[in-house]
Amino acid sequence: MSVHINAAEGQIAETVLLPGDPLRAKYIADTFLEDVVLYNEVRGMYGFTGTYKGKKVSVQGTGMGVPSMSIYANELVQSYGAKNLIRVGTAGGITPDVKVRDVVIAMSASHDMAQNRVRFNGLDYAPTASFDLLHKAYMTAKEHGIDAKVGQIFTTDQFYQDDFHHFKKWADFGCLAIEMEAAGLYTLAAKHKVNALTILTISDHLLTGEETTAEERQTTFNDMMKVALETAIQL
């Protein structure tokens, strides 16, 4: 048991999917997993363990942003022995190369994250995915006919921005999308010597203004889940 996760020893798998939305965690468990057990509902942040094609997999909601995600990632690794952390979530597209509902696999994450500014005394750290997970996810997408885009993304602390135009600079340097957790996850995984990957669905596009509905963001991103779960059973 940890401060924010009320699971018994052995209830959490070594591979954990990390959606930000706890209701998406429930949807994933109900839709894709078998023999599901609810191991956590502290603060309404649901955690489930089940099986996918016979492989034990957990799914844990994390909340939004690096500070909230970091609490759950730390406790999963330090208290429950998680070895593979796969974030599944949404992002905003910032380049014409990605469209709404595309799957993006985040190779690395530039950021404006305050935590790393403090952690590295103002120096720049390059949060990067685990290559083994990245390679498995990319090959899995290809095998299932899913046109996943692989590249750099941008992690921001601010959901509401005064000016979105500054993200054009990041797009000019190859960033595909914006989200709020990946850089923190990759940093923590490096610190604790575990594997981490972020797989995203583009839910809206800052260039075109196109967006998905709240219901779609919760329930319909099945290509992303196919890639994540088929990757998970290889670990």
Swiss-Prot record:
It is an enzyme of class 2 (transferase). GO terms for molecular function: purine-nucleoside phosphorylase activity. One of its GO terms (biological process) is purine nucleoside catabolic process. It catalyses: a purine D-ribonucleoside + phosphate = a purine nucleobase + alpha-D-ribose 1-phosphate; a purine 2'-deoxy-D-ribonucleoside + phosphate = a purine nucleobase + 2-deoxy-alpha-D-ribose 1-phosphate. It holds the Pfam family PNP_UDP_1. A purine D-ribonucleoside binds at H4, E179, M180, E181, S203, D204. Homohexamer; trimer of homodimers. This is Purine nucleoside phosphorylase DeoD-type.
